[in-house]
């Protein structure tokens, strides 16, 4: 079968110049609050947690219940009340709802689908007039409908139409709204509520909630303390992984890679934000570091032969393989093996077996990289975007990170779950397709100036003889299809714990955030302010 041709230099990628770290050793000098301060914060938070629990238990009216649970989720407090919220969700699912109240119906639909209940979207047909338009001009109701509609699956035309209708009306009304509602509408038009990274939403929402006349003071204080305690934990983790990163001697041995250890932790914290996932975040950050280094070596720096040698060494995971590597790779490779050993110690005797999966994930990654090296050197473009994705959805690294997140989790993740994840189930295929397409839209122009293999964008352009603009527009549609695919699988009952699907969706949210406007990981100045809010600036009382 004849290969399509794409012009790039064979044998050696042209290394780009990445901007240096924006944070340097900043977090190495992090000083946590004094022990008495920390103890006070935790004790006060425990008291407030129980006070809020009484509020959660005592709320029974449907409108108040919907508002309460959504507020708890946005404040980052819902994980403290999982049992109570599950009971309330069961009640909400089995309760009748005023089918004439668009806001109420939308909030109920949003909350139930967000928590895995496969409720029908036909309920929204009740709000369409004889012309097929939604019969409402209330902005709050339209905003709720807009956010609810993004939990759509394939074939739900009423939700597709709802997004078009509400977006048009919300955009038209934006300039005439009072500032608080205008800000909320503007934010939703940029990123619908369901797709926001949860911990970043919490950091942004707490100051907004503080301005609400109807706010609950106990919930507000608990939310602030809860976030600030989490921020302390994040900074301690970041101090640990920064010290680990320094041992790689990036400045001398790997000066050409993206020096982004802070951004790596930031990304992983977005996917696994809760305190109980501390070990998972640390392991994930280290895996992200290895994936970044491998990507930058093989994709943009090494010769073809050097890249293949490194891929073979990763596949062996043996100290002997280090002997044939170029000098600049040797320390990195041995450090990789040393980190695998330390991960076994961190996981403990009952979970050390899980490091096998980290190794297997990197082996899968470099096999894909080897295929892409051949594409680059042979000037090859796969004939269809589907054939491209067979390889490129694996090499984007999202599969490796999503699976790695479960290695550091508790007993709820069994060996059977990890084995199942390695089979590359459909949910992970949909997720990694989404990340690959999102990545390619933002990075293709930059990468094609550096002798990179053809991306899915170039593949689509050549397959359909179209322009880059048209290809990107089409791929945006495929990205929306990937969200629908993920949502359908998210709502489909499986033998796996619901934490698996929830975590994959959380990773999708981080991918949407990092690739929404640019490649924010590579050009990390675009997220520096948000990183400061998450790590450096506590929420004031």
Swiss-Prot record:
<dbReference type="GO" id="GO:0006952">
    <property type="term" value="P:defense response"/>
</dbReference>
<feature type="binding site">
    <location>
        <position position="295"/>
    </location>
    <ligand>
        <name>Mg(2+) 2</name>
    </ligand>
</feature>
<protein>
    <recommendedName>
        <fullName>Zingiberene synthase</fullName>
        <ecNumber>4.2.3.65</ecNumber>
    </recommendedName>
</protein>
<dbReference type="GO" id="GO:0016102">
    <property type="term" value="P:diterpenoid biosynthetic process"/>
</dbReference>
<dbReference type="GO" id="GO:0102884">
    <property type="term" value="F:alpha-zingiberene synthase activity"/>
</dbReference>
<keyword id="KW-0479">Metal-binding</keyword>
<dbReference type="InterPro" id="IPR008930">
    <property type="entry name" value="Terpenoid_cyclase/PrenylTrfase"/>
</dbReference>
<dbReference type="Pfam" id="PF03936">
    <property type="entry name" value="Terpene_synth_C"/>
</dbReference>
<feature type="short sequence motif" description="DDXXD motif">
    <location>
        <begin position="295"/>
        <end position="299"/>
    </location>
</feature>
<dbReference type="InterPro" id="IPR008949">
    <property type="entry name" value="Isoprenoid_synthase_dom_sf"/>
</dbReference>
<dbReference type="InterPro" id="IPR005630">
    <property type="entry name" value="Terpene_synthase_metal-bd"/>
</dbReference>
<keyword id="KW-0464">Manganese</keyword>
<comment type="function">
    <text>Sesquiterpene synthase converting farnesyl diphosphate into two major products, zingiberene &gt; beta-sesquiphellandrene, and five minor products, 7-epi-sesquithujene, sesquisabinene A, (E)-alpha-bergamotene, (E)-beta-farnesene and beta-bisabolene. Can also accept geranyl diphosphate as substrate, producing nine monoterpenes, with myrcene, limonene and alpha-terpinolene as the major products.</text>
</comment>
<keyword id="KW-0460">Magnesium</keyword>
<dbReference type="InterPro" id="IPR001906">
    <property type="entry name" value="Terpene_synth_N"/>
</dbReference>
<feature type="binding site">
    <location>
        <position position="295"/>
    </location>
    <ligand>
        <name>Mg(2+) 1</name>
    </ligand>
</feature>
<dbReference type="InterPro" id="IPR050148">
    <property type="entry name" value="Terpene_synthase-like"/>
</dbReference>
<keyword id="KW-0456">Lyase</keyword>
<dbReference type="InterPro" id="IPR036965">
    <property type="entry name" value="Terpene_synth_N_sf"/>
</dbReference>
<dbReference type="GO" id="GO:0010333">
    <property type="term" value="F:terpene synthase activity"/>
</dbReference>
<feature type="binding site">
    <location>
        <position position="439"/>
    </location>
    <ligand>
        <name>Mg(2+) 3</name>
    </ligand>
</feature>
<dbReference type="Pfam" id="PF01397">
    <property type="entry name" value="Terpene_synth"/>
</dbReference>
<dbReference type="GO" id="GO:0005737">
    <property type="term" value="C:cytoplasm"/>
</dbReference>
<dbReference type="InterPro" id="IPR034741">
    <property type="entry name" value="Terpene_cyclase-like_1_C"/>
</dbReference>
<comment type="pathway">
    <text>Secondary metabolite biosynthesis; terpenoid biosynthesis.</text>
</comment>
<feature type="binding site">
    <location>
        <position position="299"/>
    </location>
    <ligand>
        <name>Mg(2+) 2</name>
    </ligand>
</feature>
<dbReference type="InterPro" id="IPR044814">
    <property type="entry name" value="Terpene_cyclase_plant_C1"/>
</dbReference>
<comment type="similarity">
    <text>Belongs to the terpene synthase family.</text>
</comment>
<keyword id="KW-0963">Cytoplasm</keyword>
<feature type="binding site">
    <location>
        <position position="447"/>
    </location>
    <ligand>
        <name>Mg(2+) 3</name>
    </ligand>
</feature>
<keyword id="KW-0611">Plant defense</keyword>
<feature type="binding site">
    <location>
        <position position="299"/>
    </location>
    <ligand>
        <name>Mg(2+) 1</name>
    </ligand>
</feature>
<dbReference type="GO" id="GO:0000287">
    <property type="term" value="F:magnesium ion binding"/>
</dbReference>
<feature type="binding site">
    <location>
        <position position="443"/>
    </location>
    <ligand>
        <name>Mg(2+) 3</name>
    </ligand>
</feature>
């Amino acid at each position: 079968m004849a290969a399509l041709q794409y012009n790039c230099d064979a044998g050696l990628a042209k290394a780009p110049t990445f901007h240096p770290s924006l944070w340097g050793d900043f977090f190495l000098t992090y000083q946590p609050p004094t022990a008495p301060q920390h103890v006070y914060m935790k004790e006060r938070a425990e008291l407030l947690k129980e006070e809020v629990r009484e509020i959660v238990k005592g709320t029974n009216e449907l409108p108040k219940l919907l508002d309460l649970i959504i507020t708890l989720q946005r404040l980052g407090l819902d994980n403290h009340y999982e049992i109570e919220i599950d009971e309330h969700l069961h009640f909400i699912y089995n309760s009748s709802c005023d089918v004439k109240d668009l806001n109420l119906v939308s909030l109920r639909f949003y909350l139930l689908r967000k928590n895995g209940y496969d409720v029908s979207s036909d309920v929204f047909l009740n709000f369409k007039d004889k012309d097929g338009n939604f019969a409402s001009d209330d902005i709050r109701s339209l905003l709720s409908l807009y956010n609810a509609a993004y939990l759509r699956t394939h074939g739900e035309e009423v939700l597709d139409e709802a997004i078009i209708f509400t977006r048009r009306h919300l955009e038209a009304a934006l300039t005439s709204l009072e500032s608080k509602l205008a800000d909320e509408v503007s934010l939703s038009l940029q990123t619908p509520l369901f797709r926001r990274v949860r911990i970043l939403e919490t950091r942004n929402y707490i100051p907004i909630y503080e301005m609400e006349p109807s706010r609950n003071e106990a919930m507000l204080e608990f939310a602030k303390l809860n976030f600030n305690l989490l921020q302390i934990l994040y900074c301690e983790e970041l101090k640990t992984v920064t010290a680990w990163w320094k041992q790689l001697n990036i400045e001398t041995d790997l000066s050409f890679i993206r020096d982004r250890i802070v951004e790596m932790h930031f990304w992983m914290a977005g996917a696994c934000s809760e305190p109980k996932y501390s070990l998972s975040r640390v392991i994930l950050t280290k895996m992200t570091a290895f994936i970044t280094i491998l990507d930058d070596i093989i994709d943009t720096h090494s010769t073809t032969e050097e890249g293949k040698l490194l891929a073979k060494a990763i596949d062996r995971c043996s100290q002997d393989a280090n002997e044939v590597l170029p000098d600049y790779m040797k320390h990195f490779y041995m450090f990789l093996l040393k980190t695998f050993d330390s991960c076994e110690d961190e996981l403990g005797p009952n979970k050390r077996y899980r490091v096998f999966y980290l190794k297997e994930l990197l082996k899968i990654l470099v096999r894909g990289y080897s295929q892409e090296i051949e594409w680059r050197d042979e000037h090859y473009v796969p004939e269809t975007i589907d054939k491209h994705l067979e390889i490129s959805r694996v090499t984007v690294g999202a599969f490796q990170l999503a699976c790695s997140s479960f290695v550091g989790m508790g007993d709820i993740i069994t060996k059977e779950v990890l084995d199942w994840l390695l089979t590359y189930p459909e949910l992970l295929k949909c997720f990694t397709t989404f990340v690959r397409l999102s990545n390619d839209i933002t990075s293709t122009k930059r990468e094609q100036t550096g002798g990179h293999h053809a991306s899915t964008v170039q593949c689509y352009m050549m397959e359909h003889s179209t322009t880059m603009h048209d290809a990107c527009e089409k791929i945006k549609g495929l990205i929306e299809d990937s969200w629908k695919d993920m949502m359908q699988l998210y709502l489909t009952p499986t033998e796996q714990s619901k934490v698996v699907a929830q975590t994959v969706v959380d990773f999708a949210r981080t991918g949407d955030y990092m690739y929404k406007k640019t490649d924010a990981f590579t050009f990390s100045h675009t997220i520096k302010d948000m990183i400061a809010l998450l790590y450096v600036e506590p929420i004031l009382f």
